[in-house]
């Protein structure tokens, strides 16, 4: 294959995953509007399932009391909700703080990683639905009712994720919120047409009969949805189930967080059957190819497009790359500054994806985890 053809292929795949796929999803949503799955209504007048809300925590003393209080304030029958804090090797007083705050069950576990803590908590409870949340994520009062509604509406639903909004109390932005809005639009349409291709750790739930233990180095966010779809379950989004989470204050910090996340993600991509379409519906396979496979291939595709591009286009790419790596580009006034900040965010995230792969191949991926700096604020109460 000649260089021009290689360039067109790489550029075309990048254009498809970034622009073409979202447009195709939007068109499919419109064409299938009458056939797409209706969003389930809230379930106040239905028999509500029992729910165990599991909060894995490592060194979360400063925020765990606020999180437990937030869980207790959810608009869900108290007799059907069990709040569990699964402490993963916390030596900072997190277990004691969780007990004082009123958690129903506090597990003081040896250090084993987030997934091990979650699995242990699931094994020690018996609710119909198992919900999960991070210690620094605060749910809206009706979030749990909204999260369980799809399980009630359809017995084929095995996984449901909600929506998390990233906030910065200081008023700044690391661009994660803007990217996340784009991601949420894709997820909403994927859910309506088939199933989501990934979730989030801030707000999600699994039907107990669908729950599977995954490798401790593979997080639920990426691994569970496509695994459960392969088992015949639906993995949906509940748009009305909302949570907020404090973002990392700056783009550089967000890039460092993404690099750590990508080290875990590459474990799933390469060793967690994410590239194996067997058992998936054809539509879901196309979604995984467009949204996930190409997303992780993007850094390599960018490199191929750069090397094989015509000279003038290569010069433009290098100019844009150089500008994006200059912090000042995001501080320019007006639309130019906003565009520069988004470009910088995109380039740094591509870099984080590539470096995450390097970290995974060089060092492997550990099950341990730590809260990213700047995403926790001490509870004054």
Residue ranges and their predicted role:
Residues 151, 155-183, 216, 220-288, ...:
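Catalytic donor/gating beta->alpha subdomain of glycosyltransferases that bind UDP-sugars
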Residues 1-43, 191, 321-327, 352:
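N-terminal membrane-anchoring/stem segments of glycan-assembly enzymes
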Residues 69-80:
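Short, acidic, metal-binding catalytic loop of nucleotide-sugar glycosyltransferases
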Residues 52, 60, 70, 84-95, ...:
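A conserved acidic beta->alpha catalytic loop
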Residues 35-43, 257-321, 339-342, 364-381:
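Basic/Trp-rich segment in TM-proximal cytosolic loops or flexible interdomain/linker regions
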Residues 110, 115-117, 121, 127, ...:
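Long helical/loop segments within the catalytic core of UDP-sugar-dependent glycosyltransferases
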Residues 130:
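Short aromatic/hydrophobic "clamp" motif used to bind/position activated sugar donors
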Residues 62-66, 91-100, 142:
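Acidic helix N-cap motif at the loop->helix transition within catalytic regions
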């Amino acid at each position: 294959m000649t260089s021009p053809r290689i360039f067109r292929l790489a550029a075309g795949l990048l254009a498809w995953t970034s622009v073409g796929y979202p447009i195709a999803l939007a068109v499919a949503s419109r064409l299938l509007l009458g056939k797409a799955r209706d969003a389930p209504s809230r379930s106040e007048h239905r028999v509500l399932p029992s729910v165990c809300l599991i909060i894995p925590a490592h060194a979360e003393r400063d925020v765990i009391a606020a999180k437990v209080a937030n869980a207790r304030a959810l608009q869900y029958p108290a007799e059907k909700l069990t709040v569990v804090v699964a402490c993963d090797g916390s030596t900072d007083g997190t277990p004691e703080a969780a007990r004082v705050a009123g958690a129903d069950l506090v597990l003081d576990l040896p250090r084993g990683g987030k997934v091990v803590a979650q699995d242990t908590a699931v094994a020690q409870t018996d609710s119909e639905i198992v919900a999960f949340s991070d210690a620094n994520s605060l749910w809206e009062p009706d979030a749990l009712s909204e999260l369980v509604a799809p399980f009630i509406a359809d017995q084929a639903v095995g996984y449901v994720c909600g929506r998390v909004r990233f906030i910065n109390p200081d008023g700044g932005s690391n661009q994660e919120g803007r990217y996340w809005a784009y991601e949420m639009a894709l997820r909403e349409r994927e859910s309506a047409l088939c199933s989501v291709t990934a979730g989030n750790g801030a707000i999600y739930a699994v039907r107990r009969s669908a729950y599977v233990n995954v490798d401790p180095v593979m997080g639920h966010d990426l691994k569970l949805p496509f695994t459960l779809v392969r088992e015949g379950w639906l993995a949906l989004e509940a748009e009305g189930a909302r949570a907020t989470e404090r973002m990392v204050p700056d783009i550089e910090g967000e890039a460092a967080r993404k690099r750590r996340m990508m080290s875990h993600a590459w474990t799933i991509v390469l060793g967690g059957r994410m590239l194996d379409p067997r058992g998936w519906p054809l539509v879901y396979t196309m979604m995984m190819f467009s949204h996930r496979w190409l997303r992780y291939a993007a850094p390599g595709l960018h490199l191929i497009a750069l090397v094989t591009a015509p000279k003038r286009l290569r010069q433009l790419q290098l100019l844009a790359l150089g500008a994006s790596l200059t912090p000042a580009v995001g501080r320019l006034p007006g639309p130019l500054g906003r565009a520069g900040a988004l470009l910088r965010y995109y380039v740094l995230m591509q870099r984080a994806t590539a470096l995450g792969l390097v970290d995974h191949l060089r060092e492997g991926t550990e099950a341990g985890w730590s809260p990213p700096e700047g995403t926790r604020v001490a509870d004054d109460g």
